[in-house]
């Protein structure tokens, strides 16, 4: 494959109880089915059905978060027209680039989130501020950057590898760093779910009090697909594993796994997972390769106000072998979805929320990936990082 470079960028968008098992009622009045998570018989190119939109609760409590009109869940009748907005790239992009020797190691220079995580930590002993964990050097390790405003980033040296901002040197693919505000143990405030090459890809869970010094793996998962990620659903107080799978007819897709405990949840059997998400017939195609069917390359999610915000990385091809032959990037762009039960995602707008350029060598040439943690609320804007 042709050597490529990857850097991190920022976008902004102007803001327009315990885990409930099957049969129980959620914070918004939705009653979960007896079998939870739901068992989809198959994945197909048809858009995902969203049961709570077809049959909403008779009474909808609205005392959790601001209520967002991204669907008709809260609307009985209206003459208004819903308008969706797209993210805007910041004028100073890329906000993080490969400017350190260790970021130029591996098959290609790399300094960008590959999920990983971008967070604002209000209780950091060194002072509140923005923190970014990113892939530094292609598959070579995880680095950490800091910022006072979320736009201008620095890479202060750490004591893990003297003179560098490396927090963990490890052969990795996908990784998620999560700031767990609900964690009672201060040594586990930060959680890193990172891929581990051990007889195929597996997921290892590390914890840290500061996001710099990480524990040895507290748990290692069964075999997984390389682009597997994890997020926390605070409405139901469960961790969710977004498991990368391949499925006949739709290609790259997702299986679902949830557990209230991050460590215990790292061990599962096939029966503990459920078919979940895939690209469908409404997703965009590559403008130069329209014959290639879209696939779901990755899926991250985060709680925002009164719902779960999903970031769908839609792969539009061409296949890796063809990319190598043509010396181009495979095309991945980020689209949005919304969920009120954490499983069924409504996707009303299929435009490219965070798009790419076809300009050879540009920082966002062909391929962008969402950050773990989804987005940050900064004033009256949302900051997204890719």
Model-derived regions, located:
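Bacterial N-terminal signal peptides that target proteins for export
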Residues: 1-9
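Bacterial N-terminal signal peptides
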Residues: 8-16
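Carbohydrate-active catalytic/glycan-binding domains of CAZyme proteins
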Residues: 20-386
């Amino acid at each position: 494959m042709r050597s490529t470079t990857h850097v991190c960028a920022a976008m902004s968008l102007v803001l327009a109880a315990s885990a409930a098992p099957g049969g129980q009622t959620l914070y918004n009045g939705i009653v979960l089915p007896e079998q939870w998570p739901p068992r989809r018989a198959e994945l197909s190119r048809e858009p995902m059905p969203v049961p709570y939109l077809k049959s909403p609760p008779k009474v909808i409590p609205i005392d959790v978060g601001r209520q967002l009109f991204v669907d008709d869940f809260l609307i009985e009748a209206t003459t208004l027209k819903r308008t969706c907005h797209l993210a805007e790239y910041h004028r100073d992009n890329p906000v993080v680039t490969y400017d350190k020797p260790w970021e130029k190691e591996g098959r290609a220079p790399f300094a960008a989130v590959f999920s990983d995580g971008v967070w604002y930590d209000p209780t950091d002993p060194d002072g509140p501020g923005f923190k970014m964990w990113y892939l530094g050097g292609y598959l070579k390790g995880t680095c950490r950057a800091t910022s006072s405003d979320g736009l201008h980033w620095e890479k202060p040296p750490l004591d893990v590898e003297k003179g560098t901002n490396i927090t963990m040197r490890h052969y990795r693919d996908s990784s998620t760093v999560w700031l767990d505000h609900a964690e009672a143990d201060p040594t586990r405030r930060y959680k890193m779910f990172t891929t581990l090459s051990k007889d195929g890809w597996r997921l290892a869970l590390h914890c840290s009090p500061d996001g710099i010094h990480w524990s040895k793996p507290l748990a290692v998962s069964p075999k997984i697909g390389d682009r597997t990620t994890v997020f926390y659903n605070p409405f139901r107080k469960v961790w969710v594993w977004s498991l990368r799978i391949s499925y006949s007819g739709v290609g790259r897709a997702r299986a679902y796994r949830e557990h209230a405990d991050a460590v215990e949840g790292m061990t599962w059997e096939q029966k503990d997972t459920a078919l979940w998400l895939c690209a469908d017939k409404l997703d965009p195609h590559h403008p130069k390769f329209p014959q290639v069917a879209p696939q779901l390359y990755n899926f991250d999610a985060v709680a925002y106000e009164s719902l779960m915000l999903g970031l769908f990385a839609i792969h539009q091809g061409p296949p890796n072998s063809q990319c190598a032959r043509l010396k181009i990037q495979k095309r991945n762009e980020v689209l949005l979805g919304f969920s009120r039960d954490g499983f069924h995602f409504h996707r009303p707008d299929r435009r490219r929320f965070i798009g790419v350029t076809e300009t050879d060598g540009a920082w966002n040439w062909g391929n962008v990936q969402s950050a773990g943690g989804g987005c940050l609320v900064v004033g009256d804007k949302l900051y997204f990082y890719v």
